[in-house]
Every structure is written in structure tokens, then in C-alpha cells.
């Protein structure tokens, strides 16, 4: 059983890392990893980032890097240096400027400590993982047992009301559409030019942040196809809608 689990872990790691995936693994009994990193749990989350600048930083360090997300708890994620500066202001002395995130949403978190399960939908679609391990994967991103961050019902929120699956916006709402259309209204915003879900995911947080900074008090979003990375977009919108 352990050898099968080990083979599965190696297979997924070799195929998808470095990339937008985080692995939750069981700790060894004699592990020297700090309890402050594991939150006193018997598991640890491991990530192999793909960005060249961050990989260069990791090579310079003589130890693994433990770091929280670049956003305040429950708030919108930061996907570019200006977002980080906006969120944290003078609390940060330095910002490692690597440009805008290429994917735009957080990593997929997969629990490999037991039978494979998705703890958080993210930048790597579940369908791609299924093709590699050829096994059914449970999606537990709404589980009450939150062994992973980013799973609270209210999360990734712009701090203003947001509605999903909207056909027609109310007066004064910013209306977010998946595909660009010829509409003569300043209240309409577009996630992509041609219904591209990958680009929509990349533009999601910057567009919502832009809308909020323009002074809108409410956001309405049309129905997003719930396939591929569209599942992740809908997950983030659903959590943001709990405000």
C-alpha cells in the first residue's frame, strides 16, 4: 500500500512540478519541520514553484522557504507587485518583483497523505490530474475538516457584495462577463475576449480589484462554464459571494 502511494506521489510530482500544484504529505515521525509550519498537524504542504525569479531565490537559500499567501486573510489574492503594495503598504520592507502571475489563481492543493483528494481547486484542473493517476479523485474543497488554507466559506473577497450566475445586473452593479461584447455601458467588464477560461482565470482578481477601486459597491457575474479551470473560477466567486 505504501509503495503504491509512493509511486502515485512520484508520478504526479514528475508530471506537474514545478507548477501550480501543492502536495499535502504525511510527516515522518522524526521530522524536523517546525510545528509552526505544520500548525501542529501530522501533514505538511509542499510546493515547487515555476517562476524563474523565485526558483533563483530558492537556489540561493540553504533551506526550504515557508511562506504564507501574499494576501490578507479572506481578502483578494495579489497577483502582481502593485497588488501586494496596495494590500500591505508599509508593512513590507521588500517586494520581489516578478511581474504578474501567469495563471492568476492559487495552486491546486492535492492530499496525497491518503487516497488522493483535492483540498482546493486551483490553477491545475482536476481532469489533468485524473489522466495521470487514472483514479477517481474526491473533491473535498468544501469539507468541514480544513487541513488546508483557503477553504473557509468566505475567502478571496473584494469586501463588497458579489452575485453569481446573473443574467441581468441591477442598477449600479458592475457586471462581469466571460466574453467581450459590443455593449455601450461603462458598467460592463470582460474577463476574456473570446470565452477563454484560462485567460478569464488570469484576469479574475485584477478585474475584481479594478472594479472595487473604481468605486463600485456591488458586483454581478454572469454564469461561468463549470469545466476545467472554470471550476476554480466558480469556487473563488462562490467564496467571495459569502461577504
Where are these regions (language model features)?
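Active-site-adjacent structural elements in enzyme catalytic cores
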Residues: 6-9, 13-243
Amino acid at each position: 500500500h505504501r509503495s503504491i502511494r509512493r509511486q502515485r506521489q512520484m508520478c504526479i510530482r514528475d508530471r506537474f512540478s514545478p507548477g501550480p500544484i501543492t502536495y499535502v504529505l504525511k510527516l515522518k515521525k522524526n521530522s524536523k519541520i517546525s510545528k509552526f509550519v505544520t500548525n501542529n498537524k501530522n501533514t505538511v504542504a509542499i510546493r515547487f514553484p515555476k517562476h524563474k525569479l523565485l526558483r533563483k531565490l530558492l537556489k540561493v537559500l540553504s533551506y526550504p522557504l515557508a511562506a504564507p499567501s501574499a494576501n490578507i486573510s479572506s481578502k483578494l489574492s495579489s497577483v502582481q507587485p502593485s497588488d501586494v503594495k496596495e494590500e500591505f503598504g508599509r508593512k513590507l520592507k521588500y517586494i520581489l518583483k516578478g511581474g504578474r502571475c501567469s495563471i492568476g489563481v492559487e495552486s491546486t492543493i492535492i492530499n496525497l497523505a491518503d487516497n488522493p483528494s483535492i483540498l482546493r481547486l486551483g490553477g491545475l484542473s482536476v481532469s489533468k490530474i485524473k489522466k495521470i493517476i487514472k483514479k477517481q479523485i474526491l473533491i473535498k474543497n468544501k469539507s468541514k475538516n480544513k487541513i488546508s488554507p483557503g477553504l473557509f466559506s468566505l475567502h478571496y473577497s473584494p469586501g463588497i457584495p458579489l452575485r453569481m450566475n446573473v443574467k441581468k445586473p441591477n442598477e449600479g452593479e458592475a457586471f462581469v462577463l466571460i466574453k467581450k461584447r459590443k455593449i455601450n455601458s461603462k458598467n460592463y467588464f470582460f474577463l476574456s475576449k473570446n470565452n477563454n477560461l484560462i485567460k478569464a482565470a488570469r484576469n479574475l482578481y485584477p478585474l475584481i480589484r479594478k472594479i472595487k477601486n473604481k468605486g463600485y459597491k456591488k458586483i454581478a457575474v454572469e454564469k461561468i462554464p463549470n469545466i476545467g479551470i472554470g471550476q476554480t473560477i466558480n469556487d473563488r466567486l462562490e467564496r467571495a459571494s459569502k461577504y
